[in-house]
Curated annotation (Swiss-Prot):
GO terms for biological process: flagellated sperm motility. GO terms for cellular component: axonemal B tubule inner sheath; sperm flagellum. Residues 201-225, 308-328 form a coiled coil. It is found in: Cytoplasm, Cytoskeleton, Flagellum axoneme. It holds the Pfam family Tektin. Microtubule inner protein component of sperm flagellar doublet microtubules. The modification Phosphoserine is found at residue 14. The modification Phosphotyrosine is found at residue 372. Microtubule inner protein (MIP) part of the dynein-decorated doublet microtubules (DMTs) in sperm flagellar axoneme, which is required for motile flagellum beating. Forms an extensive interaction network cross-linking the lumen of axonemal doublet microtubules. It comes from the Eukaryota. Residues 265-286 are annotated as: Disordered. InterPro entries: Tektin-like, TEKTL1. This is Tektin-like protein 1. It comes from Mus musculus. The gene is Tektl1.
Length: 499
């Protein structure tokens, strides 16, 4: 007997449930499916890579395949013809079995280890701040040490420059004393010569050196103040940073070695031989390396470079001025020595002339005395009774001869003429002797003046050689100028010269 089976394709009319009931069930199922997808998607997005957002306009499987493509290993060809698979660069977990390297995932919600993670992050931040403070303190301390070294060099150079300035001032005092001492020469020796011109030139050059050295001292003083201020600023910032690292037991030099930098200020020294050093970090107003620290280090670097140039210039000026001052002093001393030699030559010539004149005066005096005796002999005796018989004109034979007017004897006339001639000659000799004596006295006074001038020049040279010795300080030379007063020439010599 045939059996009737129900149709497998249920028709619209064969359904028992109501359509509303069926639509409600489908809506509930669809709503649950959407809720499941949304919740699953939200649960996954709480723990996924940062750039894992897919394009909504692309199918899910296509977007996922495109997103996972960079995770796969790269195949590189070797020189020998083989291949080598390498994971892609970057952070992530390498899956060697699956030949993939997905990127690191980040959680957006706190996990069970959230408290420990936050504590670890806080410790890392604090330790990073302490390390940064320690590194900054090490940099500031090293910069302060270099500034201190530059300060010591500058102070030492200032002492050398000050000693040279004292020598220049002492040279001015020696020049003043030389001019003052040469002013005590006799008037005839004060005719301006090359030695006086050299003394004036020496004074001018010494004043120029003095101004130059004083300018160097002023520049170095300003630089010294700037270096001291920079050192105090670096010390303040260093002590401020050391408050955060006073419990850390690592020396600051070791920190600089770990950073790969020996100094952030001295750029002239060779770098520390390391593979790679840390660069100077950018200034951070709320970090350990603040703009104030950066400004202090930059100022220290600038002052260090400027001080090196100034120290080089000061040392060069000191050596040049020392050589120039020595050369000028030697020229003045050689000029005075030449003047002394010329004075000695003139003294020898004047001494010879004075000796010849003395002999001439003696001969003239002797001849004059003889002429006076001759004049007395020619004039005859004073009394008549002392006449000889041959000298008497009242003899009988003579009176008989003189009876005629034309036969008068010329004896008396010729005796009177001879006596008058001798008298005029004696007067002329007296005049010549007076001129000779006056010239002799003037020559003797000139010789004495030459001797005084030679002695004064010798004293000036001796004074200059003694006073320019390094053991003679500026105060000793100053006391000599203020207290010592050489004696003036004698009054009798001055009166003799006026004659």
């Amino acid at each position: 007997m045939p059996v009737l089976l129900p149709s497998t394709d249920p028709g619209q009319d064969s359904r028992v449930g109501a359509p509303e009931w069926r639509q409600a069930a489908k809506a509930t199922s669809r709503k649950a499916h959407l809720l499941t997808d949304r919740c699953g998607q939200e649960a996954v997005t709480m723990w996924q890579p940062k750039d894992s957002v897919l394009d909504p306009n692309v199918a899910h499987h296509l977007g996922r395949a495109a997103y996972m493509e960079p995770w796969r290993f790269r195949v590189e060809m070797l020189k020998g013809g083989g291949t080598l698979e390498k994971p892609p660069p970057g952070e992530g977990v390498t899956l060697w079995k699956g030949k993939m390297k997905p990127p690191a995932w980040y959680a957006r919600l706190p996990l069970p280890m959230h408290r420990d993670a936050r504590a670890q992050q806080t410790a890392e931040v604090v330790h990073a701040h302490a390390r940064g403070a320690r590194l900054t303190a090490a940099r500031l301390g090293r910069a302060q040490h270099q500034i201190n070294g530059q300060l010591r060099l500058l102070l030492r150079q200032r002492e050398a420059t000050d000693r040279r300035l004292s020598e220049v001032r002492k040279g001015l005092l020696i020049n003043q004393q030389s001019v003052k001492l040469r002013g005590y020469r006799p008037k005839c020796e004060k005719i301006p010569d090359k030695a006086d011109s050299l003394l004036v030139w020496e004074k001018k050059e010494l004043k120029s050196m003095k101004r130059k050295m004083e300018k160097d001292m002023e520049i170095s003083e300003d630089l010294l103040k700037a270096l001291a201020s920079c050192r105090d600023t670096l010390d303040f910032y260093c002590q401020e940073r050391l408050q955060a690292v006073e419990l850390m037991n690592q020396p600051l030099d070791k920190v600089l070695e770990q950073a790969g930098r020996h100094s952030w200020v001295d750029i002239t020294r060779p770098p520390t031989p390391r593979t790679q050093g840390l660069k100077t970090p950018p200034p951070d107003p709320i970090g350990t390396y603040t703009p104030a620290c950066a400004k202090a280090l930059f100022e220290a670097k600038r002052l260090l470079m400027e001080s090196k140039d100034i120290l080089t210039e000061m040392a060069k000026n000191e050596v040049d001025i020392q050589n120039q001052q020595q050369e000028i002093s030697n020229r003045v001393c050689s000029s005075l020595a030449q003047k002394m030699r010329e004075t000695l030559e003139l003294k020898e010539r004047m001494t010879m002339t004075l000796g010849l004149m003395r002999g001439t005066i003696h001969r003239c005096m002797k001849f004059n005395q003889e002429m006076y005796v001759t004049r007395g002999i020619i004039k005859g005796p004073l009394l008549k009774r002392n006449l000889e018989a041959r000298e008497k004109l009242n003899r009988p034979l003579v009176r008989m001869y003189q009876r005629h007017v034309g036969t008068q004897l010329p004896e008396a006339t010729r005796l009177a003429q001879g006596t008058d001639l001798l008298t005029r000659h004696n007067l002329h000799m007296e005049k010549n002797l007076k001129e000779l004596r006056t010239t002799h006295d003037n020559l003797a006074w000139g010789l004495n003046c030459k001797k005084i001038g030679h002695d004064v020049d010798y004293d000036v040279v001796r004074l200059r050689l003694r006073q320019r010795h390094p053991h003679v300080c500026y105060e000793q030379a100053q006391r000599l100028v203020n207290d010592w007063d050489p004696p003036t020439p004698a009054r009798s010599q001055t009166n003799t010269a006026s004659k």
